Amino acid sequence: MTIVKTSNLGFPRIGLNREWKKALESYWKGQTDRETLLSTLDEQFLTAIKTQIDQQIDVVPSGDFTFYDHVLDTAVMFNWIPERFRSLKDPLDTYFAIARGTKDAVSSEMTKWFNTNYHYIVPEYEKSTEFKLTHNKPLEAYEKVKKAFGVETKPVVLGLYTFVSLSKGYEPNEVKEIQQRLIPLYTQLLKELEEAGVKWVQIDEPALVTASYEDVKAVKEIYQTITEAVPALNILLQTYFDSVDAYEELVTYPVEAIGLDFVHDQGRNLDQVKKHGFPKDKILAAGVIDGRNIWRSDLGERLTFVSEVIAGAQPKEVWLQPSSSLLHVPVAKHPSEQLEEKLLNGLSYATEKLAELTTLKEGLTKGAAAIEAAINEAEQALLTLKEFAKGTNADFTAERNNLSSKDFKRPVAFEERLRIQNESLELPLLPTTTIGSFPQSAEVRSARQKWRKNEWTNAEYDEFIKKETKRWIDIQEEIGLDVLVHGEFERTDMVEYFGEKLAGFAFTKFAWVQSYGSRCVKPPIIYGDVEFTAPMTVKETVYAQSLTEKKVKGMLTGPVTILNWSFPRTDISRKDIAFQIAFALRKEVEALEEAGIQVIQVDEPALREGLPLKESDWADYLNWAAESFRLSTSSVQNETQIHTHMCYSNFEDIVDTIEDLDADVITIEHSRSHGGFLDYLEKHPYLKGLGLGVYDIHSPRVPSVEEMSQIIDDALNVCPTDRFWVNPDCGLKTRQEPETIAALKNMVTAAEVARKKLAQHA
């Protein structure tokens, strides 16, 4: 009979009340000392461990906790310190500097962790890097837990293949050499764990799900070398986020357990297990509870499914796990949460998901009858949720059925629109603008809190927003920007704001998840049909436009980003959800245009992150993603200029889709890519309006005019000057006012310098 245990891959770091975030930001602002920071973070780490112990998880991970990012942890641990930071002597200062930058050094690039909403710091390989193990972070975490609770844990290590795959700075022909140089470091790290008495270590290799058969075979040789050095150490080789194509090769790796995702694999991992079997000498770590969404599990269905997995694999032992780290969901249901009970009962966060695993284990070991009450409770909660979410959305159904190609297409082609818009908008060469949001000061946040607590009336709050909007319109005019924004002071989050005004969304007060560093977000919950109910942005945008002769952009979040940054329902397709959102936004775009707004930005920063991991699955997603954007924007007049914005992406993969959006102008985060996208544009010109971010908004440093001028000059070598825009990387909500104004002044000056150069060479 198969032995059944429960295991976890990782737990949220931020704490139930975001204690982790608050400790970091307080330290960065100089409000607390290092001792307080370290003490608070230790407390959060141990609290997370205790939660997992309390939920009766048999194999608890340690080492997944971080002060900023687990990929950065790995880079620093192996001494991958970019040269521009090596003059810093203090390890903690260096660590934070790589992530956040300093006044003299640009931070390392940040990008999406596979196809999730989490961002990691991209490790930088440099030929001058001295490869060495500077400290053993997984061992430190293991010993800390053992001292505090006296329990064995499973240290988590980012795998060698994935670490190199996520890094930058090397040529393809250097990969093997870098891997070989890292093998002794990984061996040393694991040897120290073995010598400390560690029984199990989890090595995360999610990059194997997209690896070729040849790569999977080559990586096997790496693990043969490493594991031979640590014969007493049991290794779980963990994959997640999709299926493994080279399954037959993977299961021959010289490790004691293989971790597979049976939730986000489109059924392919189970098919492989049934077709090829599973090694009798290995443990199957089966990801059977969704680690990335927040819906309660149908325990009866899951019990049947797990039984099917076990029957197909017939392993000696199975570990029931989430499909991935629980980093991507909130910590637990907060006691002060104010959701409708019918909805709340249908949700499951990290802590509740662990309880589901424990219940499934009981059902497998004692029989379904032993958990009948839990199965019935879950079934009833999901039925109640379905009834709560019920709605026909007749308007959407009728519109959806009547769609034709003209609903996805602007009246005329881009070149003709460009001519019309140039005459209508009368903008200078290299127009300057921002991406949308301005700093939300303590005063802004305080005003919002007073309003939400009913300490302020709607009229009082509206008056405050108007005052702040006018102040920033004046600031923008003084700076000399060409196309202005209203600043988004009424918005907490670019998705939450729209979801609160659309039918079919629910919002929490405490369900925070980590986005990057200390940045946390509360993703909306799409539980029902999405519908437009009333104009959402017209009032604020029209007011801002009334204050200036310059054009003010309407600012909307696009349908794919709203979908990808939400916890979506799972009873209809993602395409159908995106189209529902697109119909709602289409009405908002039309309302803005009707109100006299000539420039409308529909942001799609999350378009690329929704890509399936396997390239063979891309075409369908990219097709409906572009369709949903065009459905949102194609009903406007030729004089109306449609902008979009994207960030944190490897755009080379989706340039055809960017073209397919048919936006008049796209602004792109660029400054942290260190010129990589320009190399691509040199070979593959983009001929519509384009703004490449000229400075990094994730860092408090103010870039010089010369620095931004260089980026503009480099861009103009490959971009048409008559359709190039100058802008920051992203919105400025999280920055402080003085640095924002200083940076924008330098940006406008850099644009003016570039215009003069162009005039001299005309």
UniProtKB/Swiss-Prot annotation:
GO terms for molecular function: 5-methyltetrahydropteroyltriglutamate-homocysteine S-methyltransferase activity; zinc ion binding. L-homocysteine binds at I435, G436, S437, E488, D603. It holds the Pfam family Meth_synt_1. GO terms for biological process: methionine biosynthetic process; methylation. InterPro entries: Cbl-indep_Met_Synth_N, Cobalamin-indep_Met_synthase, Met_Synth_C/arc, UROD/MetE-like_sf. Pathway: Amino-acid biosynthesis; L-methionine biosynthesis via de novo pathway; L-methionine from L-homocysteine (MetE route): step 1/1. Keywords: Amino-acid biosynthesis, Metal-binding, Methionine biosynthesis, Methyltransferase, Repeat, Transferase, Zinc. The keyword Secreted does not apply. Its cofactor is Zn(2+). It catalyses: 5-methyltetrahydropteroyltri-L-glutamate + L-homocysteine = tetrahydropteroyltri-L-glutamate + L-methionine. Zn(2+) binds at H645, C647, E669, C730. 5-methyltetrahydropteroyltri-L-glutamate binds at R18, E19, W20, K21, K112, R519, C520, W565, E609. Its EC number is 2.1.1.14. L-methionine binds at I435, G436, S437, E488, D603. The active site is at H698. Binds 1 zinc ion per subunit. Belongs to the vitamin-B12 independent methionine synthase family. HAMAP family: Meth_synth. Catalyzes the transfer of a methyl group from 5-methyltetrahydrofolate to homocysteine resulting in methionine formation. This is 5-methyltetrahydropteroyltriglutamate--homocysteine methyltransferase. The lineage of its organism: Bacteria, Bacillati, Bacillota, Bacilli, Bacillales.
